[in-house]
Amino acid sequence: VTVTTTDAQGIYQMRVKRNAPFVFVSVPAEYEIPVENGMPKIYKKIAMGDNDVVQRSFKLERTGKKERFTLLALADVQIGRDDEVTMLDEEVLPLLIPYVQQELEAPVYGISLGDLVWDNMPFHSVYKEQIRKIGVPVFQVIGNHDHNKAITVDADADASFEAAFGPTYYSYNIGDCHFIVLDDVLYPGSSSYTADITDEQMAWLEQDL
């Protein structure tokens, strides 16, 4: 795990492990959170061999440090059936979207605090299509029900979440706040899991801070 900073021209170099799936940027407070198709996009996928050199760039827009912002917190959306998607689409979002757009002080940033789906991995993409309708960047946190319990290797159990939303741990900055997102679920398969944080994440966190 490696954390680095750019030089004055925004150039960075770093060594990464062969199996590292992503490189991501901890967006500085003076820059806007990059968005792609309505969702935060602070990461790039990487796939490389032992001696490969790859280039991944991030285009950030300097907007100045925000003195005030509103944080919208969601939790346990937990869609797992078509009727639950219908409820989210036709009952919940029609109430939430006007509230966010008309009542909350801009700029608004969201965070969804885990269990985006209910043990139904294909619904991650469905959830993504629904949540982007809110119209503000919403960061995602992985929950125990976002792990594929049919897979017995914890890192592989994250694959559906990562395909939809990117890394399971990362950080970003808004105003005077440094936000840290971690995956605190060790999921070896079946219905059981352990609440813990991997050594890899702790090593990254030490560098991040």
Each model region followed by its residue ranges:
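Short, acidic Ser/Thr/Gly-rich low-complexity loop/linker segments typical of extracellular
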Residues: V1-I11, R15
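Short, solvent-exposed loop/turn elements at domain surfaces
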Residues: T4, F24, I79-V85, P188-S190
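N-terminal secretion/transport leader regions
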Residues: V25-S26, F58
